[in-house]
């Protein structure tokens, strides 16, 4: 055979071997090759690229060369590996990509599932928000209703208290006592000169007002009278009078004096002095009994002075009148004996008998009343005639006047101050004079 025929035969045999080996190739080799050992691949490629020369051996013995090719298995395996390696590498790459995709798919699925769960949660949140929105829509109505009820309650509570605030009374004294509203609007309790209430003391037969009495007004058609406590008018609202014993003895003597005299005495019935309205004091001198002098309104610019009638007994002209005269001076010592008291009586006797005769010219010396006293010795001389003049006007016209028609004059702070000082000094001097007279006797 020619060498060309041999070469063809070898090529065919190699092809068959390669075909048979590709089908009968072991799997572990494929697994090893699939593991991707690059060093072995490079070695196989080098072996396949540079095979051992076999021409000489084949030329010598063609049949032996055909039957026993040198390193045929090795070369065939190397060729098969070189041929199949790229294919398997491609397959493994696709598989790896598929595996990577499969590994990624669960992640995406997991990511999708929480998204669904999140959607469900969002839907639940939306439902809750809807419910809360509905609740908020319903709750403002409730809150408005509660606010309205609270406002109505507060408003009604306030309205219940409003009439109490409006019904608070205010009387003339400013005490706010609701009991005073039972009486009429013009029914005001009487006042003394210094702003204190009148305190009437009921007597057996009545008593004439002495020089230290605060105020007295004649009652129509009655010769008896009630005496006002002289110490209560000068004291404060919380002070307690300390001369109850002296006052009782003085009232007893005045009761007898008033019964013996039979003349019109000052009187005051508690609660009967009612202010019936505003009074024009300019019309009083000619109509209401000359309570105020005709020139005193303009001379004193509205200041009112009180002038009161006084009654003394016939039996005790000297003692009673001189006792009242001593009440005008605080200079008489309390522990004086016969000489000092007699000097004071002699010095005052003439003056007081003259004033008594001027005030009762028709009835003699027995009815001569005492002059109302003051504490200021400098003002006695200047005001003696003034008071006597008013005393004459006061006695006769006031005898038949009704107490309802008479009205109280306007109150002034100066007159209050002077009246209060006179009342206090007169009460103190009367008590001191009575003690000195007892020591002198």
From Swiss-Prot:
Keyword DNA-binding: no
Record region (ASARM motif): 424-441
Bias (Polar residues) ranges: 211-223, 349-358, 391-405
Knockout-associated phenotype: Mutant mice exhibit increased cancellous bone mass and no loss of trabecular bone characteristics. They also exhibit decreased biomechanical strength in their bones and increased skeletal mineralization. In craniofacial complex development, mutant mice also exhibit hypermineralization in predentin, dentin and enamel of teeth and decreased expression of AMBN, ENAM, IBSP, DMP1, DSPP and SPP1. Mutant mice also exhibit hyperphostatemia and increased expression of SLC34A1/NPT2a, SLC34A3/NPT2c and VEGF in the kidney. Hyperuricemia and reduced fractional excretion of uric acid was also exhibited.
Biased composition range(s): Basic and acidic residues: 313-325
Glycosylation sites: 82, 192
Tissue: Expressed in osteocytes (at protein level). Expressed by chondrocytes, specifically in the hypertrophic zone of the bone growth plate (at protein level). Expressed in osteoblasts in bone (at protein level). Expressed by osteoblasts within the metaphysis (at protein level). Expressed at low levels in white fat, brown fat, testes, brain and aorta. Expressed in the craniofacial complex (at protein level). Expressed in odontoblasts, ameloblasts and in predentin during tooth development (at protein level). Expressed in the kidney (at protein level).
Swiss-Prot/TrEMBL induction comment: Induced by ascorbate and beta-glycerophosphate. Induced expression during bone fracture healing, with low levels of expression being detected in fibroblast-like cells at 6 days post-fracture, and increased expression at 10 days post-fracture in late hypertrophic chondrocytes. At 14 days post-fracture, expression is detected in osteocytes, osteoblasts, and hypertrophic chondrocytes. By 28 days post-fracture, expression was highest in osteocytes and lower in osteoblasts. Down-regulated by 1-alpha-25-dihydroxyvitamin D3 (calcitriol).
One Pfam family per UniProt: Osteoregulin
Keywords (A to Z) from UniProt: Biomineralization, Extracellular matrix, Glycoprotein, Phosphoprotein, Proteoglycan, Secreted, Signal
Chain positions of motif Cell attachment site: 183-185
Annotated domain remarks: The acidic serine aspartate-rich MEPE-associated (ASARM) motif is sufficient when phosphorylated to inhibit bone mineralization by osteoblasts and cartilage mineralization by chondrocytes by binding hydroxyapatite crystals during the mineralization stage. It can also inhibit dentin mineralization.
The protein's name: Matrix extracellular phosphoglycoprotein
Designated gene of the protein: Mepe
């Amino acid at each position: 055979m020619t060498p060309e025929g041999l070469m063809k035969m070898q090529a065919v045999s190699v092809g068959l071997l390669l075909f048979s080996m590709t089908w009968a190739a072991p799997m572990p080799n494929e697994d090893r090759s699939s593991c991707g050992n690059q060093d072995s691949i490079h070695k196989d490629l080098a072996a396949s690229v540079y095979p051992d020369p076999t021409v000489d051996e084949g030329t010598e013995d063609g049949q032996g060369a055909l039957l026993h090719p040198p390193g045929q298995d090795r070369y065939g395996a190397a060729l098969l590996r070189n041929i199949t390696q790229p294919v398997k590498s491609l397959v493994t790459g696709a598989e790896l990509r598929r595996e990577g995709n499969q590994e990624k798919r669960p992640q995406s699925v997991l990511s999708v599932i929480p998204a669904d769960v999140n959607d469900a949660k969002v839907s639940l949140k939306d439902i809750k928000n809807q419910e809360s929105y509905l609740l908020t829509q319903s709750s403002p109505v409730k809150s408005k209703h509660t606010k309205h009820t609270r406002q109505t309650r507060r408003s009604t509570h306030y309205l219940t208290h409003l009439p109490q605030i409006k019904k608070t009374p205010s009387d003339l004294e400013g005490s706010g006592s609701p009991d005073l509203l039972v009486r009429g609007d013009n029914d005001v309790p009487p006042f003394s000169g210094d702003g204190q209430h009148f305190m009437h003391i009921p007597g057996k037969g009545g008593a004439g007002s002495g020089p230290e009495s605060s105020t007295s007004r004649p009652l129509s058609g009655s010769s008896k009278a009630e005496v006002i406590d002289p110490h209560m008018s000068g004291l404060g609202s919380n002070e307690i009078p300390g001369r109850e014993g002296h006052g009782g003895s003085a009232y007893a003597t005045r009761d007898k004096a008033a019964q013996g005299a039979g003349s019109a005495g000052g009187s005051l019935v508690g609660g009967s002095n009612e202010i019936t309205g505003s009074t024009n004091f300019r019309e009083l001198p000619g109509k209401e009994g000359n309570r105020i002098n005709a020139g005193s309104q303009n001379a004193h610019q509205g200041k009112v002075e009180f002038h009161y009638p006084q009654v003394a007994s016939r039996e005790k002209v000297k003692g009673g009148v001189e006792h009242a005269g001593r009440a005008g001076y605080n200079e008489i010592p309390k522990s004086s004996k016969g000489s000092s008291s007699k000097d004071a009586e002699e010095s005052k006797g003439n003056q007081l008998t003259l004033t008594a005769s001027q005030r009762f010219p028709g009835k003699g010396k027995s009815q001569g009343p005492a002059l109302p006293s003051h504490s200021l010795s400098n003002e006695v001389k200047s005001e003696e005639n003034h008071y006597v003049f008013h005393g004459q006007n006061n006695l006769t016209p006031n005898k038949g006047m009704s107490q309802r028609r008479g009205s109280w004059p306007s109150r002034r702070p100066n007159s209050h101050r002077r009246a209060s000082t006179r009342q206090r000094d007169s009460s103190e001097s009367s008590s001191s004079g009575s003690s000195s007279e007892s020591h002198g006797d």
